[in-house]
Amino acid sequence: MSNETVLPLQFTEAAAKKVKLLISDEENPNLKLRVYITGGGCSGFQYGFTFDDQVNDGDMTIEKQGVELVVDPMSLQYLVGGAVDYTEGLEGSRFIVTNPNAKSTCGCGSSFSI
């Protein structure tokens, strides 16, 4: 039996590595990657990413490789069971969310419906 805590949202090694690189470029070690959900996009909800140096009451933080991912409680309810990853490919490089709660997603993967 494993003692590892199961988190409601995964923060992949690739995403943490990229966040660490971007934070070092900004020269502000207090920055964290914040993922959030807003209304909009072609499917009803859309994912957003920003760097933030604040953690608000109720926010969940996930630490990996010395950097943190921050999620507010409202967004977390739509992201449970998902993962924040970073990918580089023909369509460019970007942070992506794999979300098992999404019933459908748009072609670019930045918006979804539940």
Curated annotation (Swiss-Prot):
Keywords: Iron, Iron-sulfur, Metal-binding. Iron-sulfur cluster binds at C42, C106, C108. Binds 1 iron-sulfur cluster per subunit. It comes from the Bacteria. InterPro entries: FeS_biogenesis (IPR000361), FeS_cluster_insertion (IPR016092), FeS_cluster_insertion_CS (IPR017870), FeS_cluster_insertion_RrpA (IPR023063), HesB-like_dom_sf (IPR035903). Pfam families: Fe-S_biosyn. GO terms for molecular function: 2 iron, 2 sulfur cluster binding; 4 iron, 4 sulfur cluster binding; iron ion binding. Its cofactor is iron-sulfur cluster. GO terms for biological process: iron-sulfur cluster assembly. GO terms for cellular component: cytosol. Coiled coil: none annotated. The keyword Transmembrane helix does not apply. Gene3D superfamilies: HesB-like domain (2.60.300.12). Belongs to the HesB/IscA family. Required for insertion of 4Fe-4S clusters for at least IspG. NCBIfam families: iron-sulfur cluster assembly accessory protein, PRK13623.1. Homodimer. This is Iron-sulfur cluster insertion protein ErpA. It comes from Yersinia pestis. The lineage of its organism: Bacteria, Pseudomonadati, Pseudomonadota, Gammaproteobacteria, Enterobacterales. The gene is erpA.
